[in-house]
């Protein structure tokens, strides 16, 4: 059925349902010919069964009639008007009034839409794609699915460590996992070797065309390289993580850059020896003449800076490279404080006038912010590992790199 014709009625007497239905059929018969005879329409399935609800009180009968219709809109409206025209039920006067014509299809559509919303809500809640979960699942698959235990020493390694002609040696399991995450499957860890490198590493390296030692950018990385070389492991190239960083925390971009900048063992050792030699030659004993560094401040003027470094200070400076630390001195080169490089700016911000700091030597970058703070706090000299982008140099602060200091 398409529609429900809903009517209210009132009869001025006590009647039953058959009386009401009989009045409807009797008073609408042949009004518009057999084509719109209600019984004929019911027989053809064009109208449904007539439902009557009755309430009687005080010699009156009231109620509601529902007539299901499968006719079109115009024909359904005509049937409603015909029933409204009924004015007697039995011997009693009666009034029939149309309440509404319900579109059953609209109700069905509304129910379908509401149900669809309910289904979608449940489905969305259960099936929503969470990118973090996807990444975690993929990462977990890399960790558990690709990492293997290689050789008699059961060392953490990538799945291609045996068949790839190139081998990357790292320190620990976490380093292997990180390289696997970025697609490097020819990697193996020595797993924290101290003094003795596993025989598995020595034997595997001999079979490879190229062997790369990829190590942390700290003192620990230096020690691992020494152990590898001391145990006669075949190493062709050395790659290092950025200073102060570990291989396990590098991004894919940082890994690519570190490997692109790798050096042969000979080149690497030569560079290290040159740096050590420069340090030894530059840091002379107390009896040597004062170090004189000339730096041009303008094209027309060269200002000479004379710095005399006591022997005990020289010994301290020798230990700074690679520590990411700094030392603050007073005007007489008495050490006031040893500090992490990352804390120097905050320390200067909190510096009071009665704290007599004149010189700062540190294993870090001299930045514009640090230079401005040093000027405001009347620091006379900053010596860093290198100088960053400086656009303005205060007149009351001199800046040098350790290279300047060592090669003067």
From Swiss-Prot:
| Toprim domain: residues covered | 165-243
Enzyme Commission code: 2.7.7.101
Positions bound to Mg(2+) 2:
216, 218
Please give a single GO biological process term from the UniProt record: DNA replication, synthesis of primer
Family matches, as InterPro entries: DnaG_primase, Primase_DnaG_arc, TOPRIM_DnaG/twinkle, TOPRIM_dom
EC class name: transferase
Spell out the GO cellular component terms annotated for this protein, sorted alphabetically and separated by semicolons. Answer: cytoplasm; DNA-directed RNA polymerase complex; exosome (RNase complex); primosome complex
Quote the record's binding site residues for Mg(2+) 1.
Answer: 171, 216
Co-factor binding details: Binds two Mg(2+) per subunit.
Q: Which Gene3D superfamilies match?
A: 3.40.1360.10
Reaction it catalyzes: ssDNA + n NTP = ssDNA/pppN(pN)n-1 hybrid + (n-1) diphosphate
User: GO MF terms on file?
Assistant: DNA-directed RNA polymerase activity; metal ion binding; poly(A) binding
Cofactor (UniProt): Mg(2+)
> What PROSITE patterns has UniProt attached to this entry?
TOPRIM
Per UniProt, which keywords does this protein have?
DNA replication, DNA-directed RNA polymerase, Exosome, Magnesium, Metal-binding, Nucleotidyltransferase, Primosome, Transcription, Transferase
The task this protein performs is described as: RNA polymerase that catalyzes the synthesis of short RNA molecules used as primers for DNA polymerase during DNA replication. Also part of the exosome, which is a complex involved in RNA degradation. Acts as a poly(A)-binding protein that enhances the interaction between heteromeric, adenine-rich transcripts and the exosome.
Q: How does it assemble?
A: Forms a ternary complex with MCM helicase and DNA. Component of the archaeal exosome complex.
Q: Which family does it belong to?
A: Belongs to the archaeal DnaG primase family.
From the Swiss-Prot or TrEMBL record, give the protein name: DNA primase DnaG
Q: What is the lineage of its organism?
A: Archaea, Thermoproteota, Thermoprotei, Sulfolobales, Sulfolobaceae
